[in-house]
C-alpha cells in the first residue's frame, strides 16, 4: 500500500468512488504540505513528521467539521513541530474546521489557540482566551502546568518597573511590548534632559 491509497481509505468507507476518494486524498495531502512526489511511497518509509501529515490528511480527506488532535507534535523536532502547527492553523482558516488541540506545550497553546480550556482532575478549571488563563499562572503551576516562559519574563520585567503588559503570552507580543516600553522610557529621559556634573 502507498500513501495515496492509505489516505483514500476513509473517503472510500464513506461510499465515495475511487476517483472521488483520490481527489479528496490528493487535496488533503497537499493541504498538509505533503509533496506529490511522495504519494506513491510506502507509509513505512516516511519520517515522523511525514507520518503525522499523512495521518492528518487521512482524516481531512473525509471532510470533518471538527478535528481533534491529541499531542500532534509529540516526538517532532522544533522545525517539524512549527510546520505541523502552522499547517493546522492554516486548515482552520482555509477550511473553517473547528480544531481541538490537546497539548501540554503552553508555548504552542499560547501561539495557536483562540480559546483555552484547562481540565484538572476531570473538571474544567479555566475556559477563556489564553491571555486571561495564563494570568493565573500560579494556579496553573499548582495543577502541574506551566505558563509560557514569556509570561514569567513579562511578570519579572513588570516587577522590576518596566511598563509592560504581564499578560503577553507570545514572543512576538512581548517583543512589541518591550520595544514600546523602552521607547517610552527613552522619550521620558530625553524630555527630562540629562544633567552633566
Task: Mark where each language-model region is.
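A short, surface-exposed alpha-helical micro-motif characterized by mixed small hydrophobic
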Residues: 109-111
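Conserved ABC ATPase signature
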Residues: 42-46, 50
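Catalytic Walker B motif of ABC-type/P-loop ATPase nucleotide-binding domains
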Residues: 67-70
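Hydrophobic anchor residue at the start of the ABC signature
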Residues: 56
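Conserved ABC ATPase "signature" region
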Residues: 20-37
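Conserved ABC ATPase "signature" C-loop
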Residues: 121-122
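Conserved catalytic motifs of ABC-family nucleotide-binding domains
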Residues: 63
Amino acid at each position: 500500500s502507498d500513501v495515496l491509497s492509505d489516505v483514500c481509505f476513509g473517503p472510500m468507507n464513506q461510499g465515495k468512488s475511487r476517483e472521488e476518494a483520490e481527489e479528496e486524498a490528493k487535496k488533503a495531502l497537499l493541504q498538509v504540505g505533503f509533496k506529490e512526489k511522495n504519494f506513491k511511497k510506502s507509509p513505512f518509509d516516511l519520517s515522523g513528521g511525514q507520518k503525522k501529515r499523512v495521518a492528518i490528511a487521512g482524516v481531512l480527506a473525509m471532510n470533518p467539521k471538527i478535528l481533534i488532535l491529541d499531542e500532534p507534535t509529540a516526538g517532532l523536532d522544533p522545525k517539524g513541530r512549527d510546520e505541523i502547527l502552522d499547517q493546522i492553523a492554516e486548515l482552520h482558516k482555509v477550511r473553517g474546521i473547528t480544531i481541538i488541540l490537546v497539548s501540554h506545550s503552553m508555548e504552542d497553546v499560547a501561539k495557536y489557540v483562540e480559546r483555552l480550556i484547562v481540565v484538572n482532575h476531570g473538571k474544567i478549571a479555566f475556559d477563556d482566551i489564553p491571555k486571561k488563563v495564563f494570568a493565573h499562572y500560579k494556579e496553573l503551576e499548582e495543577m502541574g502546568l506551566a505558563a509560557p516562559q514569556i509570561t514569567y519574563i513579562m511578570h519579572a520585567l513588570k516587577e522590576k518597573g518596566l511598563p509592560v503588559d504581564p499578560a503577553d503570552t507570545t514572543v512576538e507580543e512581548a517583543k512589541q511590548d518591550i520595544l514600546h516600553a523602552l521607547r517610552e522610557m527613552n522619550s521620558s529621559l530625553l524630555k527630562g534632559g540629562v544633567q552633566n556634573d
